[in-house]
Amino acid sequence: MKDSHSSRRKYEKEKLVFATNNGKRTEGTPAFLKSGNTASSSSPTLQFRPTSRYPTLSHEPVYTNVLDLSSRIDANRASIMSATMGTPPSALKFSKKKISRPVVSEDTFKDKLPRATIPVKPEPQPQYKIPAAPAPTSKRVVNRGLKLNTNLRQASPILPSPSLKLDRQDAPIQINHEQKEDFLVSIPRPTPMTNLDDGKDEIGQPDPHRKYMAPPRVNSISRVQRRMSYIPYGGFDDFLDNYYKDDDTVLEDNQLKSNSRIETLEEEDGAESDSITNTVSNASSDAEPAHRHLGPVYENSGHLPSKSHFSSTDSNTDSFGLESDERSLPSVSNDLKSSETLKNPRNDDLLTLQQPPRYPHSQMVMLPARSPVEVPAPTFDRRNVSRNSNNNSPEGYDNNRTNPTVNNLPSYPTNLARPKAIKPMPTSIHGQTSPLSPIPPVHTTHGLVSDIRPLPSVSSPIMRADSTPISHNLAVTPSFSPIPQQSNKSIGNHKNTSVANVSSKVANSKFERNISMMSNSNASSPAIFEVGAEAKEKTKDAIPCHPDDKLMIPSPKIVTHGDAMQEEQRLRQKSQITPDDEVELAKVYLNALETLENKPSLAPDQASYNTRINVYRTRAVELLKKNAYPSKTQNTVPEALFLIGQFHSQGVLGFRRDLGKAFELYSLAAKKGHPLSNYRVAVCLQTGTGVKPDTSKCVAIYKKAAEMDVVEAMFRIALIYLNGLLGQKRNISLGVQWLERACKSKGPESVRAMYELAKIYEQPDRYGVSATPERKFELYKQSAVYGYAAAQCKLGECYEHGLLGCLAEPRRSIFWYTRAAEQDYGEAELGLSGWYLTGSEGILPKNGEEALLWAHKAACKGLAKAQYAVGFMMEQGIGVAADPSSAHNWYIRAAKQGFPKAKKRLEEQALSSKQTHSKAPKKKQQEQCVVM
């Protein structure tokens, strides 16, 4: 019996599939019955492979030990399969063809097998599984993302993964069109491909590296600040870009909106020319305003606008003090000028900007981002004064108070002369100071206190760019001292607080909750950050980010004191030092100076900070002057001329601001073949900065700089040809060629060229050129990842409405709208208003207050659509109590700019008012008749 069982097991494991000479297929013959385990037949045979559904031809029999062939297929079933060309028996239910069923008796094996080793015939089972019929109720349920995929092949979630593959053309089973959707379907795939991300890794576990962003809120969103840099490289060189006029640079459909923002007038000569704001860096813009606003942190210091910001006081004048028939725009905190006033850079009126000035040699950085976890509520201190016994606090402050009211806050002076001595080193930004402890003050020579934003807590997000926030007034961006949670009640119930919600019905508890969600710096950023497992449980409103949505803004170059000394030592060891080597060493000193001013924590103490600042500045200027104004035996280095011209343009590092002197230095460097100097000479000739305007020379030098591969010059000359500016004939084909050439670098300096080229491709009727949706989306995406606000807003629109081959994905749309809103881009702010108005399930809840605040923020920038949206929300009572009179004023503003919906709404209101007045007398007469 033991031999019998062992032989039986051996028999069941071995399988041999081969065909006989007469064409009949047999299966399951034991291997030891075949003499020599070889096949004597030379005719082709049919073999069954475990990886193939159908039999294939082969000239040699194959001996296989197949794991999936544990159940045999008897000879009768094999004959049927052969006669029907592989059709399974289930498909032959209604077949009328008579099939011969040859019978193979087991007596043929009895003579050759021992009686005890005859195997027991198992029950026949099919080799494959036939899927069950789909459920009739959900037969047509197919994922939309699956339908738009070509190379992505995925089984329908209705049925388990079938073992039948329908990608072969010779499949005998006939399946109707409706059933094909429940099997493996291959559908064209759009470009770009949208990843169906579910937040899990390959093995189905939650991804610990998943990135989130905080919901974009008006009063807590961060603002993109400019990092001061003495070397104007890295990104688009927008030198004197704000002196351009709209008619000279912008396309007819107003595509380059950033060029129309004129920042201010030139500073007056005399002592005031040496007076600049006391920022962490001494650099300033070529268009630096004489008076600057306190920045978005002061304007949005946790205050929700009250109803009075939106309502009108009488029939002709609204809360902004503007008559309904005026052209000027409303504003909350700044007096905005009209676009006609902003176009003239030589206007004598004082321009108060709503956003920080743009620096032609700067890099964008982000303010520290808050943690989505609830943190202690901040006070509204604008200066962080240490709580000590001495009374050195400014007027209006009480050191013993933990929560001074807003009414007692002192105002900052915005125009004070810079002290001649080196300013003290600010408090360490990256030290170990706890955010709950007060930051020691830093007293300047004027007795004022400059604060540094404290380090975020442990659960705070990781910064997108390691940088220091820069303010544009006498003090650095202020920090807010946290207070215990129990003081929230006193804040919310204080009678003198100026914080008010848009809706008058919002309770104090809701206000306290809003305050508690703010960071201790009041600059919470929806920037990307990583959240750990513990923070994930506490973060309920965080929005998951798509892995493909990220920015590629280059990090600022950091040169430490050790790097500078190492470079100096390396230069001293050289046998011969050239003028170019000395200029490169001067640039190292400038980078070290910039790093130390933006990161004062790198200095160990105050004395080291002052010494290094002096050394870096002195050595850099000496080396540059030596090679810019050399003796007769030396050659002038163009780079030194260019950098000193840059300093004269800005008035930094001890150089007096002199635009004429700067133009002379740019011209000398341009004659020496310096590429960027040629571009700046052309800009000066076009705008008349430091020289008399000359359009003919301007175009010639633009072409010369473009031939030197200056991307900015390519972009300018392309706009000139596209619009026929500066006396040139309109040549669209040549302009498009220059734009395409400018886009080849695909770097930060090409952001405007890529955006403009994509906009031109979207207007084939006007320009006669077009491109595929994939190409247009690629240009927008490359421009957006380098931080261009207009392109970021366009991506948000694409992901909102499913444009340019994209899938409609709310989280990606909100992400890119937020990136553009951080740069005060009006269209993006209106887009966020729309998302808050409608909400997105599981991503962003509805919030009427935020919708109104974002729309109002965009309306204050003069956006007609946003003005209509504010009027609509105020008329319907969304986010604020209904106020038809104020809504009417907003409709008038939008209608004056030609917005059709606003005009239509005003006509409807006029018609309804006429009908009301016409019906009123008749009703009165009827009442009189009834009485009589």
UniProtKB/Swiss-Prot annotation:
Q: Where does the record place Basic and acidic residues bias?
A: 1-16, 337-349
Cystine pairs annotated here are: none
Q: Which InterPro entries does its entry note?
A: Chitin_Synth_Reg, Sel1-like, TPR-like_helical_dom_sf
Keywords carried by this UniProt record: Phosphoprotein, Repeat
Q: Polar residues bias located where?
A: 35-53, 274-285, 308-319
Question: Which positions does the record annotate as the modified residue Phosphoserine?
Answer: 393
| Sequence segments annotated as region (Disordered) | 1-53, 264-356, 374-406, 905-932
Q: Where are the Sel1-like repeats?
A: 638-674, 675-710, 711-747, 751-788, 789-825, 826-863, 864-899
UniProt cross-references to SMART domains, sorted A to Z: SEL1
Instruction: Report the GO terms under cellular component.
Output: cell division site; cell tip; cytosol; mitotic spindle pole body; nucleus
Keyword Acyltransferase found: no
Q: Which Pfam families match?
A: Sel1
Which Gene Ontology terms describe the biological processes this protein takes part in?
Answer: fungal-type cell wall organization
Q: What is this protein called?
A: Chitin synthase regulatory factor 3
Q: Organism source for this protein?
A: Schizosaccharomyces pombe (strain 972 / ATCC 24843) (Fission yeast)
